[in-house]
From Swiss-Prot:
Binds 1 FAD per subunit. Binds 1 [2Fe-2S] cluster per subunit. GO terms for biological process: 'de novo' UMP biosynthetic process. Heterotetramer of 2 PyrK and 2 PyrD type B subunits. However, the metal reductase complex seems to be composed of a heterooctamer of 4 PyrK and 4 PyrD subunits. Pathway: Pyrimidine metabolism; UMP biosynthesis via de novo pathway; orotate from (S)-dihydroorotate (NAD(+) route): step 1/1. This is Dihydroorotate dehydrogenase B (NAD(+)), electron transfer subunit.
Amino acid sequence: MSKVFDAKVLAVYMVAPNTYYMEFDAPDIARLAVPGQFVHVRCGETNDPLLRRPISIHMVSRPKGVLALLFRVVGKGTEILSQQKPGDRVNMMGPLGRGFTLPLPGSKVAVAAGGIGAAPLVFLVQELANIKCQVTVYLGARDKRSILCDGQFIQMEAEVVIATDDGSLGFKGTVPELMKRHMDWRKTAMTYVCGPGIMMKEISTMLAEADVPGEVSLEERMGCGVGACLSCAVKISHHGQISNKRACFEGPVFPSWQVVWE
């Protein structure tokens, strides 16, 4: 069950343009969290901004009780959060949402990340490494400076293949284009995806055509974070029936073949 905590900031620094890494002393969240879940963060001490911000869990250290977040500054709330200092306290709810489904130990899996979508996938690859999975990470961004988490994935002994839109690092093109050239669909037991909607839509179509199971982590605007306000509803198809599901409660992770992409 998720709870509300005042977590002490342990570290904060910029890792890429407008992108920040933060560590918190949050033993209860670190103990309970699974890959794909998020925390709902109160970014300041006043009511401006009023709403909390959902931020995916980047990594945890359960022995140390440390929670790590990786986020991009996109507005007032995340800008305020990025200005916190070690020793400050940040109010957060968590862990929230449905996380990723882990495959059988030793499985060959693919992980596709675009931009800040790499953030929740580090925790996932950490857990996949713990069960001896063979992991290939398809990592993309606009340019070399915007590539995130490649070093962390490599430290976890994942194979990392990079694509940049401008060709400044790795393959010139998109992550879906890279996967078409590189991926062995027949030997892939599971694929996990997080990134821009257009990327996730294209990869989901590819997975359906190859009959490969996959899960996507959706990044939706959220109000309450606990399923009450319905502001994060997404269309899901199940056995031919389309219904609205709450990204904060039934998600943010959904089977790739169930998402009705706009």
